[in-house]
From Swiss-Prot:
Lineage start: Bacteria, Pseudomonadati, Pseudomonadota, Gammaproteobacteria, Enterobacterales
Protein's name in the database: Zinc import ATP-binding protein ZnuC
Protein's organism: Pectobacterium atrosepticum (strain SCRI 1043 / ATCC BAA-672) (Erwinia carotovora subsp. atroseptica)
This protein's record includes keyword Lyase: no
InterPro entries associated with the record: AAA+_ATPase (IPR003593), ABC_transporter-like_ATP-bd (IPR003439), Metal_Ion_Import_ABC (IPR050153), P-loop_NTPase (IPR027417)
GN (gene name): znuC
Subcellular localization, as worded in the UniProt entry: Cell inner membrane
Length: 252
């Protein structure tokens, strides 16, 4: 399995403030890594490092300069007074050929949105259009920054199903970022919990047979969603300092 991006003990400091400390991770073709963490954990900074938009203060990043990356941003801010159809929005990407737009939208089941105004789309529809735009360069790595933000549970299940299909079709690596600390995509190969440093990592615990989970999401939801249980040996105080836990759960 080929390695697309490798981060080795990277740290990022802005002035006297350390944003990321000693982060190591590997993104591989055909595998999904979900990055979890609360607001302010450094997730967006880490994404910028992976995308090559920010150089780490220390540590090393190994990435093929020709690596094709498809990026779906966390938020899309559009002027509500600006007439902009999905077709025109897709063409704003440099080098896009008009004949490639409809096939990309079809891949994400959004061909019917081609001439719809971007400002009128629902959260789930917007995410599908952004995914289609990210596919235009045949990516080897998909970076999805909170792709289910503003999308209801049914929409989340549909998006997760779609992301898995795209992973299989393109055999691309996927880095997915989320602030939901307990609900992640069941097809995730690895979960990495971040709070300035790597708090914990591992595979998600699939709870597809749990009666409460099935009652909430049904069998289809159980196939697409999973709960990840965190096992930390520490917590963070209000200043972000690490407080180690003793055995039995008390702080050291």
């Amino acid at each position: 399995m080929s390695t697309l991006v490798s981060l080795n003990n990277i740290s990022v400091t802005f002035g006297s403030r350390k944003i990321l400390s000693d982060i190591s991770l590997t993104l591989q073709a055909g595998r999904i890594l979900t990055l979890l963490g609360p607001n302010g954990a450094g997730k967006s900074t880490l994404v910028r490092v992976v995308l090559g938009l920010l150089a780490p203060t220390s540590g090393s990043l190994v990435r093929d300069p020709a690596l094709r990356i498809g990026y779906v941003p966390q938020k899309l801010h559009l002027d509500t007074t600006l007439p902009l159809t999905v077709s025109r929005f897709m063409q704003l990407r440099p080098g896009v050929k008009k004949q490639d737009i409809l096939p990309a939208l079809k891949r994400v089941q959004a061909a019917h949105l081609l001439e719809q105004p971007m400002q009128k789309l629902s959260g789930g529809e917007t995410q599908r259009v952004l995914l289609a735009r990210a596919l235009l360069n045949q990516p080897q790595l998909l970076v999805l920054d909170e792709p289910t933000q503003g999308v209801d549970v049914n929409g989340q299940m549909a998006l997760y199903d779609l992301i898995n299909q795209l992973r299989q079709e393109f055999h691309c690596g996927v880095l997915m970022v989320s602030h939901d600390l307990h609900l992640v995509m069941a097809k995730t190969d690895e979960v990495l919990c971040l709070n300035q440093h790597v708090c914990c990592s591992g595979t998600p615990e699939v709870v597809s047979l749990h009666p409460e989970f099935l009652a909430m999401f049904g069998h289809r939801g159980a196939e697409q969603l999973a709960i990840y249980r965190h096992h930390h040996n520490h917590r963070h105080d209000l200043q972000g300092r690490i407080i180690l836990k003793r055995q039995g759960g008390n702080d050291a």
